[in-house]
Curated annotation (Swiss-Prot):
Disulfide bond positions: none
Gene name, Swiss-Prot/TrEMBL: lgt
Biased composition (Polar residues): 323-334
Organism ancestry: Bacteria, Bacillati, Actinomycetota, Actinomycetes, Micrococcales
NCBIfam families the record matches: lgt
Protein name: Phosphatidylglycerol--prolipoprotein diacylglyceryl transferase
Origin superkingdom: Bacteria
Membrane topology: Multi-pass membrane protein
Length: 334
């Protein structure tokens, strides 16, 4: 090709795992990338919540529920939508000490839509526990989540996952010939659409779009989350339609992930409409009534007496010999 880029090479299998001599096991590169995305999202979400008046670090109390349930949801969704990968004659379905079990998330197979469902349940529990408004937390999380998803797609690149139909474009992705997702009959050296890269670009653009719309229209009450759902659903519906995933369950000839992307768009539109009708003003604060957190600085400024000031006042009275008269008790009780 005369183009400046002939193709995008994929990392070799040695990149998929990291071996440290002092550890008895290998660390999955994909897991480290996902962890990086979670940390970035947590830090940014915490900053956005703190600006709204939430307690610093409260995001960790919510993520304590959201992350584990998100991981469980991601795995369950993948198992349900890819039954042929787990349920076949002679398959090891349940034994986690053998390859192929449904519990073995380190072998790959985690779905973002399942993570969103499980994570949403976890956020609901965490917000109820901390007293945060669900919509406030969801709005603070939305752009950070999209950025975390962009980071996570680098893990798909390392694992040679999430690629699309064959292409002759100069940025076609090289995939090892032994990859099980490659359709039978394609010639050696066939290049594929780098869907992981497309989604990274789409998600990063979406972060800026969400932030601009949030500031331009002062979006609250879950409407930032709604924009996230619409944006991500639109992009993912197209990418899934050109993705090669032969084991994915389909309904009416449409892959399950495309249906999930459509559902995300519809849900986002419903949230926008319903919340615009129910809440015309701004949120009164990040906490539910009666669950508010008051910062130490605010307590001092509210007029509460500092114990040190009382001690200093007593010392001044002793030096000057002046004392304030004590109020006489009318009830006679001590």
């Amino acid at each position: 090709m005369s183009s400046w880029m002939a193709s995008i090479p994929s990392p070799g299998p040695e990149w998929a795992q990291i071996h440290l001599p002092f550890l008895p096991f290998r660390i999955q590169t994909y897991a480290l990338i996902i962890l990086t995305g979670i940390v970035v999202a947590a830090m940014w979400t915490s900053r956005r919540l703190t600006k709204r008046g939430a307690e610093p670090g409260v995001v960790l109390d919510v993520l304590l529920w959201a992350v584990p349930l998100g991981i469980i949801g991601a795995r369950l969704y993948h198992v349900v939508t890819h039954p042929a990968d787990f349920f076949y004659p002679g398959a090891n379905v349940w034994n986690p000490f053998q390859p192929g079990a449904i519990w073995n998330i380190w072998e790959g197979g985690n779905a973002i839509f399942g993570a969103l469902i499980g994570g949403a349940v976890g956020v609901g529990i965490g917000c109820r526990w901390t007293g945060l408004r669900f919509w406030t937390f969801a709005d603070a999380l939305a752009p950070a989540l999209l950025l975390a998803q962009a980071i996570g797609r680098l893990g798909n690149y390392v694992n040679q996952e999430l690629f699309g139909l064959p292409t002759s474009l100069p940025w076609g992705l090289e995939i090892a010939s032994g990859n099980k997702a490659i359709p039978v009959g394609l010639p050696e050296g066939t290049l594929f659409q780098p869907l992981f890269l497309y989604e990274i670009v789409w998600n990063v653009i979406g972060v800026f779009v969400i932030l601009w719309l949030e500031r331009r229209f002062r979006l609250q009450w879950g409407r930032v989350l709604a924009v996230y759902l619409i944006w991500y659903g639109l992009g993912r519906s197209y990418l899934e339609s050109i993705r090669i995933d032969p084991s994915e369950f389909s309904f009416l000839g449409i892959p399950s992930n495309v249906w999930a992307a459509f559902a995300a768009v519809v849900l986002g539109a419903i949230i926008l409409r319903v919340q615009a009708q129910r809440h015309t003003g701004l949120e009164p604060g990040p906490y539910l009534p009666g669950r508010e957190w008051v910062s130490p600085q605010a307590e001092v400024e509210s007029g509460e007496t500092d114990p040190e000031e009382i001690l200093h006042a007593d010392d001044d009275e002793e030096r000057t010999g002046t004392h304030k008269p004590q109020a006489t008790s009318l009830s006679g009780s001590n």
